[in-house]
Amino acid sequence: MKEKRKCECFSNPAVRGILIALVAVCLIFSGCEKAGVDDSAINPTVTVEEGVALPRFEQEVLLCSDEAKQVYDGELKIENAVATGTPYRPFVFEYQLDQASGILRLSEDSSFADAQEYNLDQSKTSVMIDNLKTGTTYHYQVEVSGKQYSGTFRTASSNRFISIPGVENLRDIGGYKTLDGKTIKQGLLIRGCELDGIKNEDYFLADQDVAAVQKTFGFVYDLDLRSPEITEGDYQSRLGAQVGHQFYDAPTYAQIFRPEYQDSLRRIFADLADPDKYPMYLHCTWGRDRTGTVVLLLQGLLNVSQEDLMQEYRLTGYVTPAVATNNKMDTVFMQLGAYEGDTLQEQIINYLTTVVGVTQEEIESIQSIFLE
């Protein structure tokens, strides 16, 4: 995969004394106390005027643990990484202000048309920012007393792990490079566990967290791979009444080849082909078996390598350690090999179109939605 980068952090006390105003994006996604992570290297700061210091971004900023990055880069096996704890790392912007307050703006666009704003309070020394994209250039702007300071930084390429209160096994399926040199877009499909606590009461998205989740992700569809039998009567997505929802009773692993699951798969891929259903949250109960199977087929038809497909599946080992080493997908790959095609992508597409009933137009729509 990609070149290795170090985690960075501004937690050195000596440096804090220098940051008199806005280390206007002391964006050290990897370091900070949210996950009990040790601080590491320091970005040097530059004083731009009296009372104002800004970071100089000499390296990319890491949004995951060192071990998770090593897994991504092919330097460490996932089974050796899962014991190190959660792979997610927030971005922490540390600062000191000699004014009462300031504003930090972050955007992927240099015009700041879609900027997210964060208040900087003189009584605090940091603001934590969750769920930025990996492998992405960000523009930042800090405003204090009518003066603006701006710059850019880039996040390191890695798996994009997601943090949502009360929910686990979350990640963006985007960011992967395909075998033909394209990239799966981030921000379109987040995979995870159930949100309603029906099977596991610990997995529950609380009412007070819904607005923040929607501000970040803007989900319009809840693709629920569970059976409708888990609940009685009308069902509403925890993501909000305005969010579309459907149960699919999806298969797991080699069940995808059983005739009784063909209609379920056909409906799933028909909805994955609908551009109006994105951004989408895709899940089952644990975000493991049914979700892992559907994501494998989806990323496979997008031409992700078999090695990366297995890595994406086994990242669930951070929540369920046994998944980091299990071989349940081997039967899936073996049976897909019986279908016409010189590549795994061709075999998956032929299976979906000739057996499941997914149309070629739907395949092309999915590829158009996800690839850049």
Task: Describe each region flagged by the PLM.
Residues 286, 290-291:
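Ser/Thr-glycine-rich phosphate-binding loops at phosphate-binding pockets of nucleotides
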Residues 3-18:
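Bacterial N-terminal signal peptides that target proteins for export
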Residues 27-31:
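C-terminal motif of bacterial Sec signal peptides marking the signal peptidase cleavage site
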Residues 20-24:
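Sec-dependent N-terminal signal peptides
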Residues 33-281, 293-372:
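Cys-dependent protein tyrosine phosphatase-like superfamily
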